[in-house]
């Protein structure tokens, strides 16, 4: 089993290139099912989850070719024959559920195993299914599978009880061929949703977002294959911002969408991190003394839950008391016991974590319990005195492209060993 070994205390310097967003790439790959033609997704991040969803498409008959050097993924869904993707692949990743919308839209039916992914809460699929049912889909759940069929999809007004990203994406994709007009109210507003809409519209869909944030989809007859480059990964960018701040370093981050990272920038500036935006780049100066902050994770445009663990690592080293309240997932503090191994002072109170900054962290052996927890442990290891070993790093590989190589280029001492 691979692990990371980090020797802390190094100052970072130089530039790092951000990859395209995994959370954009996965629904876009799923959406290629809709057109039944050849699509090319450019600059795909070579991540475990990307390989899983590409294998998932292969399991239903799609042809997928990946250029490992350029990251270009060529997908031909013209010969998809099965409506039941490989169950073992589905169980590897929760994002597998993103093929429900495209499958019901193009084929009128699907059978899919209940999915896997990070164990950070129940993350129910009821909102996905509620949206599909509103469009006229019949759904049965039993023996670990979800089976669905629809003789005809009809547009409807759908109100989401919570602005779920996955549910919003599935309903959008399920609606592109539905007769009439579908309106999704209280839809998720994440930049990755906008990217999916842009991709679908370039294929020939008729989707728009109005001032209220509602998404309107007017059904079309067909879509065409296209070439497309997804947006940059705002969560990876945020992780490297913290890498600079936690090591008291100055670095340049290339591949930043200013609008998408504004919610994070607000908190980073409140802490005292200096940031200068230069086009698609961000210059980070983390050499100031930082101040504690209180954070509440919220749907976009609030502070992202996917950055909660990473900023906790930074607050562990920031003098004073900070409070993080997690409102999205009910089980997303699994990194706390691992951070305590470094000497962090954290107490959990319900959905809140109270962090009292300590003067220094000490290297230790820790385990990545999920994707973002793994990133948080790497960040702690960068500043900890001595050597840190992090196991179960396959979680990290689900969301970060060669993070150890990018950090090494900046001057960190981190290596992957078996």
From Swiss-Prot:
Location of the active site: 118 (proton donor)
Residue positions binding UDP-N-acetyl-alpha-D-glucosamine: 94, 123-127, 306, 328
Modified residue annotations for 2-(S-cysteinyl)pyruvic acid O-phosphothioketal: 118
GO MF annotation: an example: UDP-N-acetylglucosamine 1-carboxyvinyltransferase activity
Keyword Cell wall biogenesis/degradation assigned: yes
Places the protein is found: Cytoplasm
Keyword field contains Cell cycle: yes
Pathway, per record: Cell wall biogenesis; peptidoglycan biosynthesis
Binding site for phosphoenolpyruvate: 22-23
UniProt keyword annotations, A-Z: Cell cycle, Cell division, Cell shape, Cell wall biogenesis/degradation, Cytoplasm, Peptidoglycan synthesis, Pyruvate, Transferase
Any single Pfam family the record assigns to this protein: EPSP_synthase
Reactions listed under catalytic activity: phosphoenolpyruvate + UDP-N-acetyl-alpha-D-glucosamine = UDP-N-acetyl-3-O-(1-carboxyvinyl)-alpha-D-glucosamine + phosphate
Example GO BP: regulation of cell shape
Enzyme Commission numbers on file: 2.5.1.7
Highest taxon of source: Bacteria
GO cellular component terms, semicolon-separated: cytoplasm
PANTHER family documented for this protein: UDP-N-ACETYLGLUCOSAMINE 1-CARBOXYVINYLTRANSFERASE (PTHR43783:SF1)
Function statement: Cell wall formation. Adds enolpyruvyl to UDP-N-acetylglucosamine.
Family: Belongs to the EPSP synthase family. MurA subfamily.
Protein name as catalogued: UDP-N-acetylglucosamine 1-carboxyvinyltransferase 1
Source organism (scientific name): Clostridium acetobutylicum (strain ATCC 824 / DSM 792 / JCM 1419 / IAM 19013 / LMG 5710 / NBRC 13948 / NRRL B-527 / VKM B-1787 / 2291 / W)
């Amino acid at each position: 089993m691979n692990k990371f070994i980090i020797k802390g205390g190094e100052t970072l310097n130089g530039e790092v290139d951000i990859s395209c967003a995994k959370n954009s790439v996965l629904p876009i790959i799923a959406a290629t099912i809709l057109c039944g033609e050849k699509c090319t997704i450019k600059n795909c991040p070579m991540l475990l989850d990307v390989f899983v969803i590409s294998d998932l498409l292969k399991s239903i008959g799609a042809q997928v070719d990946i250029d490992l050097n350029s990251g270009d993924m060529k997908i031909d869904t013209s010969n998809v024959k099965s409506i039941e993707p490989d169950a073992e692949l589905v169980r590897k990743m929760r994002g597998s559920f993103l093929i429900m919308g495209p499958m019901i839209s193009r084929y009128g039916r699907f059978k899919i195993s209940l999915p896997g992914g990070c164990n950070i809460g129940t993350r129910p699929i009821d909102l996905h299914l509620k949206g599909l049912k509103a469009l006229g889909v019949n759904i049965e759940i039993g023996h670990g599978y979800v089976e669905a069929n629809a003789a005809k999809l009809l547009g409807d007004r759908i109100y989401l009880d919570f602005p779920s990203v996955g549910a919003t994406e599935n309903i959008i994709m399920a609606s592109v061929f539905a007769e009439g007009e579908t309106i999704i109210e209280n839809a998720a507003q994440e930049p990755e949703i906008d990217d999916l809409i842009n991709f679908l519209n370039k294929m020939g869909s008729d989707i728009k977002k109005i001032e209220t944030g509602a998404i309107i989809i007017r059904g079309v007859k067909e879509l065409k294959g296209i070439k497309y480059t997804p947006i940059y990964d705002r969560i990876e960018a945020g992780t490297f911002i913290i890498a600079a701040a936690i090591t008291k370093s100055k670095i340049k981050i290339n591949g930043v969408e200013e609008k998408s990272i504004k919610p994070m920038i607000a908190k980073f500036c409140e802490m005292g991190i200096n940031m200068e935006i230069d086009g698609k780049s961000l210059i980070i100066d983390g050499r100031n003394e930082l101040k504690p902050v209180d954070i509440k994770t919220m749907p976009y445009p609030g502070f992202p839950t996917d950055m909660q663990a990473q900023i906790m690592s930074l607050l562990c080293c920031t003098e004073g008391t900070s409070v993080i309240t997690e409102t999205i997932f009910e089980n997303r503090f699994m990194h706390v016991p691992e951070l305590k191994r470094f000497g962090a002072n954290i107490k959990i109170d319900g959905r809140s974590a109270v962090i009292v900054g300590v003067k220094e962290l000490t290297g230790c052996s820790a385990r990545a319990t999920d994707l973002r927890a793994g990133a948080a442990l790497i960040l702690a290891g960068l500043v900890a005195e001595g050597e840190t070993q992090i196991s179960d790093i396959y979680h990290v590989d689900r969301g970060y492209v060669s993070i150890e190589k990018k950090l090494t280029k900046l001057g960190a001492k981190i290596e992957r060993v078996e």
